[in-house]
Amino acid sequence: MKAVWQGWWRRGRVVARSLQGPVRSPAGLGEPRFRTFDEPLAWVIVALLTIGLVMVYSASIAYADADRATHSRFYYLIRHALSLGVALGAGWCVFRVPTRIWQRWAPKIFLLAIVLLALVLVPGIGKVVNGSRRWISLGFMNLQPSELMKLAVVVYAADFTSRKAVYLQGFFLESLWKGFVPMAGAIVLVGGLLLAEPDFGAFAVVAVIAMATLFLGGINGRIFFGLLIIGAVAAVGLVVSSPYRMERVVGFLDPWQDPYGKGYQLSHSLIAFGRGEWFGVGLGQSVEKLFYLPEAHTDFLMAVIGEEFGFAGIATVVGLFAWLVWRAFHIGRESRKLERHFQALAAQAIGIWIGWQCFINIGVNLGLLPTKGLTLPLLSYGGSAILANCMALAILLRIDWENRLLMRGYKV
């Protein structure tokens, strides 16, 4: 173990030197200079985190100012900034770890995430908020294991798919029993733990990450098509079997039928977008965040962005996310060219995670999807979510960093 940590430390020093500026290729004989990390991707991540910090303060100031327990209108801003600092520090540590280590430890990471999900359900350990048992209190912060499970599924699904590629791409029965069934069993276990909290939104994200990774790994087409049908039927069954979820669907179909009951959140979200028009009412000038729109600084942050910055602000945020997802898939394609199959799948799975969760959150805010308890990645208030997002993007940056060095003759 000591030797492993020493190896990571030495590699970390190389990373630190490379981040200070351009370096020369191995030959060093008149070849062009190059940078060893993806600067545009890093700046897009910084831009999204900065937008999130500003908008969390804007959306939460009324809540913090009215709550005597917080003693400050900067309460949520300070907590979000501290969470962001911890997340960036964790991201830096993750960036220094070679991706082969993540692949080697993927099953253990996945198992640890399952244990944390199980601990949430234990009375006295799991913390109940708004009727859901999703958090573990650590004293200085509340840890939400479902957010860490998303990262665990990314590395585990990428590792599993890269190891089982021969079976996944083989005959139907071989692909089914040796490729699909083990992964399906793991996701069903995770789904049972998440639905027990309950956290249907996190389960939807985890299931899509796993399914999409199997698809990218070349799973038999008939199995994947059957999986889509089974997934759709299961989703409908979960909604119909829960009166709470049915109420959300009914409120989603016509929020104006009961604007003070089932459709309250969605109706006020739509009002916020309507007030924003093209360029918004200005930073800090939102009316809906003044106790009209619940969860304005978490699940419905995009509605506040729409009200204060209008269509232009929404288009900017969506454009940044779209570029980030495209870049993740591009890094995955570059990894595949280098025959780094785990890294390729992990990069694209991170892109799927960010893109799919953004799609659900923005769709809910716009009334295109039923209300879910999912935050907007990198922007919404929430320490565990920011931590998991920054760690995932650090892995993405590390994959790209290793690709660049390999293409120029370095070993990683």
Swiss-Prot record:
One of its GO terms (biological process) is cell wall organization. Residues 1-40, 95-108, 156-175, 221-222, 325-348, 397-412 are cytoplasmic. Pathway: Cell wall biogenesis; peptidoglycan biosynthesis. GO terms for cellular component: cell division site; plasma membrane. Residues 62-73, 130-134, 197-199, 244-303, 370-375 are periplasmic. Keywords: Cell cycle, Cell division, Cell inner membrane, Cell membrane, Cell shape, Cell wall biogenesis/degradation, Glycosyltransferase, Membrane, Peptidoglycan synthesis, Transferase, Transmembrane, Transmembrane helix. Belongs to the SEDS family. FtsW subfamily. Peptidoglycan polymerase that is essential for cell division. NCBIfam families: ftsW. This is Probable peptidoglycan glycosyltransferase FtsW. The lineage of its organism: Bacteria, Pseudomonadati, Pseudomonadota, Betaproteobacteria, Neisseriales.
